Amino acid sequence: GAAHAAKYGHDRYGKTYAGAYRDWKPGQKIHLIGHSMGGQTIRYLEELLRHGSPEEVEYQKQHGGDISPLYKGGQDNMISSITTIATPHNGTHAADLLGNEEIIRQVAYDYARSKGNKLSHVDVGLSQWGLKQREDETLAQYIQRVKQSKLWTTKDNGFYDLTTEGTDILNQKTLA
């Protein structure tokens, strides 16, 4: 949402995916299955459907603009069950030791940056952080813009979300 994007310094919208079940709506409950970090994502989706995001609602009141119905909550009749497979609900020690270390993030982000240029056909899914070269942008301009991305210093990423600290924050937000 807009509040989240403003808080962490990235674009509000990233890549958009077409829904797999286009007729999903309140009253038509579905069963969701998530593997690994997908289990965390599903749990947070259910939290938003049920309770919304007070932070997003307040931001919209103060700044105007549109707000997704997802952030308004009140949809506790959309998910029948959640099944998670190999989901690190309490984080992983590997993520604590390596996953969120600067050197690991740097290698991963350097790879992503190099694949975000106009000539690459690889989509690393980080366009919200500016890791996609614009059509009117030179390679030098792109590299300079990427250097200034807040991605390099944020905890708003999967590396952090898989740590025991990151999952503790998620667990406090969800009813699990």
What is each stretch, according to the model?
Residues 1-30:
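Active-site catalytic motif of lipid deacylating hydrolases and related acyltransferases
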Residues 22-25, 35, 73-75:
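Short, charge-rich binding segments
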Residues 32-34, 85:
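Short beta-strand immediately N-terminal to the catalytic nucleophile in serine-hydrolase-like folds
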Residues 34-38, 42:
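Gly/Ala-rich beta-loop-alpha elbow adjacent to hydrolase catalytic centers
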Residues 47-176:
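Helical cap/lid subdomain of alpha/beta-hydrolase-fold lipid enzymes
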